Amino acid sequence: MALLPDKEKLLRNFLRCANWEEKYLYIIELGQRLPELRAEDRSPQNSIQGCQSQVWIVMRQNAQGIIELQGDSDAAIVKGLIAVVFILYDQMTPQDIVNFDVRPWFEKMALTQHLTPSRSQGLEAMIRAIRAKAAALS
């Protein structure tokens, strides 16, 4: 995830945006920084239900017990939201992910109040899926 900022830099960059158009463009830019997802990872088992767009999230645990996330979407803004979620969960163990509450970060960014209801539901579906997979690993 070297191409993506850490949590604090994400928040600083987001708060520097002058308006919501700039914030949306920043979110889209973050999505463009995600590594390409392999074709074989675009499978039903990695598909996230509850998203209006197609979303795939792959979760692997490395030898140190840290979760490595990869993902993609067919919608640019959703791909950016995937990147935001991955930044928040970066370098965490399964138990860290289960215990970590992303909502305060979204509140600091005022993110969910500026998303359409379907995008907010999709974001929640992504977080639920990641937390459920992490709980199964912890």
Curated annotation (Swiss-Prot):
It is found in: Cytoplasm. The active site is at C51 (cysteine persulfide intermediate). Its main location: cytoplasm. The keyword Cytoplasm applies. Transmembrane segments: none annotated. GO terms for biological process: iron-sulfur cluster assembly; sulfur compound metabolic process. Pathway: Cofactor biosynthesis; iron-sulfur cluster biosynthesis. Keywords: Cytoplasm. One of its GO terms (cellular component) is cytoplasm. Belongs to the SufE family. Participates in cysteine desulfuration mediated by SufS. Cysteine desulfuration mobilizes sulfur from L-cysteine to yield L-alanine and constitutes an essential step in sulfur metabolism for biosynthesis of a variety of sulfur-containing biomolecules. Functions as a sulfur acceptor for SufS, by mediating the direct transfer of the sulfur atom from the S-sulfanylcysteine of SufS, an intermediate product of cysteine desulfuration process. Homodimer. Interacts with SufS. This is Cysteine desulfuration protein SufE. The gene is sufE.
